């Protein structure tokens, strides 16, 4: 490592280490390069021995840099028994709501990376993946609210970067874990890493099965424009079964001290079975029954990701100079199969329907990055990148013919859709430091070539090209050793993912249908962030104020079908002007070594408007999460927490508030190699009523679900192995953060 010195001259450095004799070294530096490259330090062993020392102080959980904030999961005892999704609730400026949707600064438009690179398994289903990922396998979670020019321009609110634990030392180490709950859910996993000479391997695998309890659901809609089909009611039950696999394999090889190669692969696969059984009634304005039927549906989505990364890193003899060449391939299948049975009970005919949607996204990415330090602790970075993204969807609808006993495809029901993007980008940026002042600035240019085609209807094909210039700048000022003020401006863009683009018509509910919009443009956002941080030995605080505005926001909207006036239709469009002003606050207080209190929350005022459809909405949204941690003798730990979220504002309504709490007790055995835990989520309430209200001048829709909250579980993990030496890791890699996804996974 190197040490930057204030001016030219001679200095004495005093060095000490436990078990070593203190040493002193004199060094001299010039005005042209006031930096001491430390190199190797040699210290003699101290023959004296120490008695047993018990360290009871707690390390800080949060630290800050010019453009980001870092939450250290390795130092949080609760991470040993929690999944990563639950731990995200404790990360400053991050929120997880009652439906497991993730938000950054109160906004769902952001990106999640793994180890500084985009990850296919996290781009399409982050909640599901993070819920299956043990928090004990995570080292840090970085919140990058002011991404620099090196990052893709997408991700309106910023980036959440998940850094995996790097237990890759000479020798081997591993962890095995298992968990079971009273709600018929179980899971387990293993982590192994080893190093032999210049070769290092890391592997991780997790399996999870969940059987969600039956939930009561209701839906009431009033159609203000159709007196004959005025009132629609649907009452019934919903339940799910799901099974998830997640695996990770990484290998590194040190060619020499200057060159490093790494290859890694990620695998995620989730198979669900969703069931709903509903009684449906339609009544006129006088509340007389028009028709009624029972609807049973079984939906089987299968989705996941296969991802392969290859990186070559070259370091020069200039400290910090780095050249990285990276390639990435991802395959993200997203299949869906739905079978629906309608049984008429009054003025309605029986029928069976079978829909399939075979969708996938393949992506090839190549990237070259170069960073060069310059005198005075500054550095410059530049790079180029190319992405080929191919999205396909094949849609088939079948109806059952009672007379022939065969399935047949209605005319026009088959759709073969293809969406191809070529994205070219180049960037230039720099980081500059002068004593207490730091500046990070850059500019990125992205060109996009877009082709959309329909094999069964060539008249719908289209092609477009466009270029975006994206600037960014962040200023930071350090007040003493423990305080920092940061001001940043970012322009970001967001491209629509397959869930937004897919024209597949979801008719699981024939009276409330939905589909994507392949004509969506990328949305552009401008944001300003002001951040203050104070860190002391016992008290930490991070406060931020931000404002963001988008003039062509991608929003979901609902309307009544003009050809079928009893059917509501939901789709997406660049229809929204969105302004969001927010305040976020994080506090951590440790008055004594064995106790910690934390609080993470924020409040936002959101305003949305669409003049063309005469739609608008505004209001306050907020969230709060707080808890305490106790560390007792004999390696016992107790964690208690609670959270509350205000209703979420939408263009045509709002979603209900949400309350939850939990308690966890941990005990370590055998020198902290074995950890046993018991926990309970929301022990004081069995269910919570989730509500969703959607409305405009033509209709009002009110939906509810009684979500089961109470859950008891136990988990156990065991750590084994021995390690003696570290090996190097690739410092930079590919980051694709340009796709906006939804479809039940972080819906905005």
Residue ranges and their predicted role:
Residues 158-176, 215, 233, 244-250, 449-451, 481-526, 547-565, 683-697, ...:
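Surface-exposed extracellular loop regions of Gram-negative outer-membrane beta-barrel proteins
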Residues 84, 117-145:
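Short acidic/polar hinge/loop motifs at secondary-structure boundaries
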Residues 14-20, 34-77, 97-99, 105-109, ...:
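Short, acidic, small-residue-rich periplasmic hinge/interaction motif at the N-terminus
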Residues 235, 363-367, 408-415, 420, ...:
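Outer membrane beta-barrel strand-and-loop segments of large Gram-negative receptors
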Residues 6-28:
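A short, solvent-exposed loop/turn motif at the edges and junctions
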């Amino acid at each position: 490592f190197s040490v930057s010195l204030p001016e030219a001259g001679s200095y004495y450095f005093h060095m000490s280490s436990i078990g070593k004799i203190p040493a002193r070294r004199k060094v001299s530096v010039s005005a042209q390069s006031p930096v001491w490259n430390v190199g190797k330090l040699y210290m003699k062993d101290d023959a004296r021995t120490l008695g047993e020392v018990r360290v009871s102080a707690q390390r800080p959980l949060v630290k800050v840099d010019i453009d980001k904030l870092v939450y250290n999961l390795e130092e949080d005892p609760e991470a040993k028994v929690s999944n990563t999704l639950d731990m995200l609730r404790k990360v400053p400026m991050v929120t997880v709501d009652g439906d497991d949707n993730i938000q950054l600064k109160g906004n769902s438009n952001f990106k999640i990376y793994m180890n500084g690179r985009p990850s296919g398994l996290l781009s399409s289903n982050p909640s599901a993946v993070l819920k299956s990922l043990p928090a004990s396998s995570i080292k840090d979670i970085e919140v990058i609210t002011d991404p620099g020019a090196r990052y893709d321009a997408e991700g309106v609110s910023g980036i959440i970067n998940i850094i995996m634990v790097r237990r890759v030392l000479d020798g081997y180490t591993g962890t095995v874990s298992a968990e079971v709950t009273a709600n018929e859910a179980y899971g387990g996993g293993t982590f192994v890493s080893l190093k032999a000479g210049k070769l290092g391997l890391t592997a991780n695998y997790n399996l999870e099965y969940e059987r969600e309890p039956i939930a009561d659901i209701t839906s009431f809609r009033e159609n203000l424009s159709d007196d004959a089909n005025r009132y629609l009611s649907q009452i019934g039950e919903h339940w799910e079964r799901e099974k998830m696999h997640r695996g990770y394999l990484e290998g590194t090889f040190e060619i020499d001290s200057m060159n490093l190669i790494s290859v890694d692969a990620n695998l995620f696969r989730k198979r669900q079975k969703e069931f709903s059984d509903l009684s449906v009634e339609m009544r006129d304005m006088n509340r007389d029954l028009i028709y009624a039927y029972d609807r049973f549906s079984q939906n089987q989505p299968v989705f996941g990701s296969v991802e392969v990364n290859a990186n070559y890193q070259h370091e020069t003899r200039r400290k910090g100079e780095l050249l990285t060449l990276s390639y990435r391939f991802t395959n993200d299948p997203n299949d869906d199969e739905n079978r629906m049975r309608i049984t008429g009970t009054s003025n309605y005919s029986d029928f069976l329907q079978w829909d399939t949607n075979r969708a996938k996204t393949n992506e090839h990415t190549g990237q070259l990055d170069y960073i060069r330090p310059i005198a005075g602790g500054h550095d410059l970075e530049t790079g180029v990148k190319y992405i080929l993204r191919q999205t396909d969807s094949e849609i088939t609808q079948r109806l059952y013919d009672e007379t022939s006993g065969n399935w047949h495809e209605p005319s026009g029901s088959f759709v073969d859709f293809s969406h191809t993007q070529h994205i070219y980008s180049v960037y230039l940026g720099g980081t500059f430091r002068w004593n207490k002042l730091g500046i990070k600035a850059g500019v990125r240019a992205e060109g996009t070539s877009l082709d959309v085609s329909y094999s069964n209807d060539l008249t719908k094909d289209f092609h477009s090209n466009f270029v975006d210039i994206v600037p960014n700048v962040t200023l930071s000022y350090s007040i003493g050793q423990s305080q920092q003020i940061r001001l940043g401006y970012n322009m970001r863009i967001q491209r629509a993912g397959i869930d937004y683009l897919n024209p597949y018509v979801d008719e699981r509910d024939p009276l409330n249908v939905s589909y994507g919009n392949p004509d969506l443009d990328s949305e552009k956002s401008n944001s300003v962030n002001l951040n203050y941080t104070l860190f002391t030995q016992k008290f930490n605080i991070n406060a931020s104020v931000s404002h963001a505005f988008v003039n062509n926001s991608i929003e979901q909207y609902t309307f009544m079908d003009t050809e079928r006036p009893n059917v509501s239709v939901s789709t997406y469009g660049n229809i929204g002007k969105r302004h969001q002003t927010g305040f976020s606050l994080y506090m951590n207080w440790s008055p004594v070594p064995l106790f910690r209190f934390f609080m993470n929350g924020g409040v936002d005022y959101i305003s949305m408007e669409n003049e063309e459809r005469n739609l608008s909405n505004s209001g306050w949204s907020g969230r709060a999460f707080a808890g305490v941690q106790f560390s007792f003798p004999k390696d016992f730990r107790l964690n208690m927490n609670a959270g509350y979220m205000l209703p979420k504002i939408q263009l045509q309504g709002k979603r209900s508030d949400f309350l939850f709490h939990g308690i966890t007790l941990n005990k370590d055995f055998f020198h902290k190699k074995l950890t046993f835990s018991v926990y309970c989520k929301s022990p004081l309430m069995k269910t919570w009523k989730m509500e969703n209200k959607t409305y405009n001048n033509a209709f009002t829709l009110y939906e509810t679900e009684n979500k089961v909250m109470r859950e008891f579980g136990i988990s156990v993990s065991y750590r084994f192995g021995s390690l003696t030496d570290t090996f190097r890791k690739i410092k930079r890699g590919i980051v694709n953060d340009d796709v906006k996804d939804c479809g039940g996974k972080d819906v905005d």
